[in-house]
Amino acid sequence: MLDTTALLHWPLDRLAGGLCAMSQRGELERLSHARMLLIEAADLRWEQPSEASLDVARRAGAASGDLPRLSPVDLDVLALALDGGHELVTDDYRMQNTARKAGLVVHALATTGAREVWSWVWRCVGCRKEHDVASDAPSARRGNGPDCDVCGSPTQMKRRRG
């Protein structure tokens, strides 16, 4: 299973036979129209994840705590990888973390890859209570999480202690 980073940077012969999510086409077109034209000539399998596999990916993202920082394209890629038990090629640390926590084999491209698997939680800035990430958490690259159910203060994503 190839992440968009592999599509952008790997030689075409290394991409042959790789599995990709249909949603990656739009991402690739936005990032590099010229590369997208080259990719069209590569022997890739383009698939759309099922709702059931997307639900599995969301639950895996919630279990690791990474869900709010995963994009819809990230979730599509994870869903296809989880659905088929495919190895995942990505430099995205959040995707690596979620995939490893879900039991998938992950390969980094240009980085050394994540050395540890972490769990993330929403921690209240007021009372410091930790809240698990819900499987229906909205995706946002930055910003606070839901308000604390104890004191009403905003929460921030933090690595789970202990």
Task: Please place each PLM-identified region on the residue numbering.
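Feature 3881 marks metal-assisted phosphotransfer/nuclease machinery
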Residues: M1-G84, R94-G162
